[in-house]
Design a protein with these regions (language model features):
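Active-site beta->alpha N-cap acidic-glycine motif
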Residues: 1-66, 70-84, 90
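Catalytic domains of cell-wall/extracellular-matrix polysaccharide-remodeling enzymes
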Residues: 15, 37, 62-139
Length: 139
């Protein structure tokens, strides 16, 4: 099992890192480049905590249906922002909304080593409170 977060970085990132530390586990955080630029110290804290970083593109907009140049720009700007803030050159991508089609892969295959998705979704942006989220994940 792997823990992954589509997590800004945002105000919740430090709390997530603290819980991971207390439990003795790490996770992979998929960050958008614009959020990294706004919170580079938090992005660096993720790496310093021993967690892996992947990109969620630059602006977290859907890549599906975008032309080759737009896809490549979103990926490149996202990974460049992450490298600038953390020193890590990532080639992991979690496409926003899991929207990454065969043409996107062809257009970006030299920029991305793997496109990571998920198989259990906490629905955290839809649910009210931790108890409801835990129930959703465990059910």
């Amino acid at each position: 099992m792997a823990l992954t977060f589509d997590e800004g970085p945002s105000g919740a990132t430090k709390q997530i890192l603290q819980v991971l530390k207390e439990k003795g586990v790490t996770a992979t955080f998929f960050l958008s480049g614009d959020a990294v630029e706004a919170s580079s110290a938090t992005a660096k804290a993720i790496v310093d905590a021993g967690c892996e970083i992947g990109s969620n593109s630059y602006s977290d907009d859907s890549l599906k249906g975008q032309d080759r140049e737009a896809v490549r720009e979103q990926i490149t700007k996202g990974t460049d922002a992450i490298k600038s803030a953390t020193g890590v050159k990532t080639m992991l991508l979690r496409a926003p909304y899991a929207a990454f089609d065969e043409q996107n892969w062809i257009d970006a295959m030299d920029l991305v080593s793997a496109v990571v998705s998920w198989n259990i979704d906490s629905g955290d942006w839809l649910l009210n409170g931790a108890d409801e989220q835990v129930s959703t994940v465990l059910d």
